[in-house]
């Protein structure tokens, strides 16, 4: 009779023999010794709150910051800290005055890389404003007289109610004086890294031109009449010839860049159109540009448009605003911003509201439509 061998390859699969314990692991000099791991709860229970300590240290280090100009530490809500040197400055102590707390990074005058204002040559000034050649004086006089005759012939003989008409700008007669006036504007724009623009710009990625529809204006928008439209077109052609209103851009240590009359300007004279990039207001809510102008105020906030003269602009961005909280400062207003519907699109025009004498600075109300701009620090 044959006997059964358990080690034989022909062993029965029904055998009840099984391995109940793994063999002991052989020690190896290469493998590290076993480590006991702690749970995350045990680690967090014994950890030190480093972040909170840093925040407390930061608060303590900034609690004694004082203004570098006046030496006072009062008015924490108006004390700006330079993001580079950590020195403090009151907004009203800075020159020029800062009217609102910057949203992004802010650098003091010593740490900022400000471009020095430099004078430009005649060739560079003409190239900056894209003026090809000065028209001869007699040709200009004949052209203006011909335009006047055409406008007189187009007038109706019927008696109408007297209306305040928009007047065309009157440039200085001396061409050298006009060149010097344009030179001050070119130097100011160059110092801020802004390119000259005589119209609205529609940049890809911002608001398209199709979004600029005056019919979307909340409550409606006044339409520029035909006669005033002819005056506007006449002034725009004069701008392209280098015939600008008698204005110069000067730098004031308190107010920054300001616009000053270099000759007399009559009431209701067209000064300039507010120009720049057109964008949706929702895209500029965290923008530090202090010269944003409302173009279209829509019932739907997502369709409200603004003009942003941070990359392209003209002399209109340098005209300062009045202090709405000071009755005396309100008397300085001598021009206004008016929004018109022109060919179904919104446009913003700057117009004189009274006679302006030579040497007088130009001011208008920044809060003419919306009371959103802080002017309590204005002079």
From Swiss-Prot:
PROSITE patterns: SET, ZF_PHD_1, ZF_PHD_2
Catalytic activity field: L-lysyl(27)-[histone H3] + S-adenosyl-L-methionine = N(6)-methyl-L-lysyl(27)-[histone H3] + S-adenosyl-L-homocysteine + H(+)
Compositionally biased intervals (Low complexity): 1-15
Gene Ontology BP terms: DNA-mediated transformation; methylation; pollen development; regulation of cell cycle; regulation of DNA replication
E.C. number(s) listed in UniProt: 2.1.1.369
Transit peptide location: 1-44
Phenotype seen when the gene is deleted: No visible phenotype. Atxr5 and atxr6 double mutant is smaller than wild-type plants, shows partial decondensation of the chromocenter, decreased H3K27 monomethylation and increased DNA re-replication.
Tissue expression summary: Expressed in leaves, roots, stems, flowers, siliques and developing pollen. Up-regulated in tissues where cell division is active.
ZnF PHD-type span: 64-114
UniProt GO MF annotations: histone H3K27 methyltransferase activity; histone H3K27 monomethyltransferase activity; zinc ion binding
Region called Disordered, residue ranges: 1-42
Domain of life per record: Eukaryota
Domain SET: 245-367
Keywords (A to Z) from UniProt: Chloroplast, Chromatin regulator, Metal-binding, Methyltransferase, Nucleus, Plastid, S-adenosyl-L-methionine, Transferase, Transit peptide, Zinc, Zinc-finger
Location within or outside the cell: Nucleus; Plastid, Chloroplast
Residues annotated for S-adenosyl-L-methionine binding in this entry: 255-257, 317-321, 366, 373
Annotated motif PIP motif, positions: 122-129
Protein purpose: Histone methyltransferase that specifically monomethylates 'Lys-27' of histone H3 (H3K27me1). Has much higher activity on nucleosomes containing H3.1 than H3.3. Involved in the formation of constitutive heterochromatin and the silencing of heterochromatic elements. Influences which sets of rRNA gene variants are expressed or silenced.
Family of the protein in this entry: Belongs to the class V-like SAM-binding methyltransferase superfamily. Histone-lysine methyltransferase family. TRX/MLL subfamily.
Subunit structure as annotated in this protein's UniProt entry: Isoform 1 but not isoform 2 interacts with PCNA1 and PCNA2. Interacts (via PHD domain) with HTR1 (via N-terminus). Isoform 2 interacts with IPS1.
Name of this protein: Histone-lysine N-methyltransferase ATXR5
Source organism per UniProt: Arabidopsis thaliana (Mouse-ear cress)
């Amino acid at each position: 009779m044959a006997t059964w061998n358990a080690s034989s390859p022909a062993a029965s699969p029904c055998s009840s023999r099984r391995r109940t314990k793994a063999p002991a692991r052989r020690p190896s000099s290469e493998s590290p010794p076993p480590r006991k791991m702690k749970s995350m709860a045990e680690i967090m229970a014994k950890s030190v709150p480093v972040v909170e300590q840093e925040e407390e240290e930061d608060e303590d280090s900034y609690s004694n910051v004082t203004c570098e100009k006046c030496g006072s530490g009062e008015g924490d809500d108006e004390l700006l800290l330079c993001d580079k040197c950590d020195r403090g400055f009151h907004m009203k102590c800075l020159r020029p005055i800062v009217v609102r707390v910057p949203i992004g990074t802010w650098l003091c005058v010593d740490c900022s890389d400000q471009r020095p204002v430099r004078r430009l040559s005649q060739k560079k000034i003409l190239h900056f404003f894209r003026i090809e050649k000065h028209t001869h004086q007699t040709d200009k006089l004949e052209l203006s007289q011909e335009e006047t005759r055409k406008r007189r012939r187009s007038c109706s003989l019927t008696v109408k109610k007297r209306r305040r008409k928009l007047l065309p700008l009157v440039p200085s007669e001396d061409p050298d004086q006009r060149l010097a006036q344009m030179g001050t504007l070119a130097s100011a724009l160059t110092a801020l890294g802004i390119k000259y623009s005589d119209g609205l710009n529609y940049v890809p990625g911002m608001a398209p031109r199709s979004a600029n529809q005056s019919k979307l204006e909340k409550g409606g928008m006044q339409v520029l009449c035909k006669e005033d439209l002819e005056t506007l077109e006449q002034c725009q052609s004069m701008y392209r010839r280098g015939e600008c209103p008698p204005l110069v851009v000067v730098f004031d240590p308190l107010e920054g860049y300001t616009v000053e009359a270099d000759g007399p300007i009559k009431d209701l004279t067209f000064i300039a159109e507010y120009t720049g990039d057109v964008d949706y207001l929702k895209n500029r809510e965290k923008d530090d540009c202090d010269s944003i102008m409302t173009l279209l105020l829509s019932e739907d906030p997502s369709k409200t448009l603004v003009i942003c003269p941070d990359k392209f602009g003209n002399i209109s961005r340098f005209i300062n605003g009045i202090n709405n909280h000071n009755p005396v400062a309100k008397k300085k207003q001598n021009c206004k911003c008016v929004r018109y519907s022109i060919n179904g699109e919104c446009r913003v025009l700057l117009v004189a509201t009274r006679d302006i004498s030579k040497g007088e600075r130009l001011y208008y109300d920044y809060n003419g439509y919306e009371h959103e701009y802080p002017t309590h620090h204005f002079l």
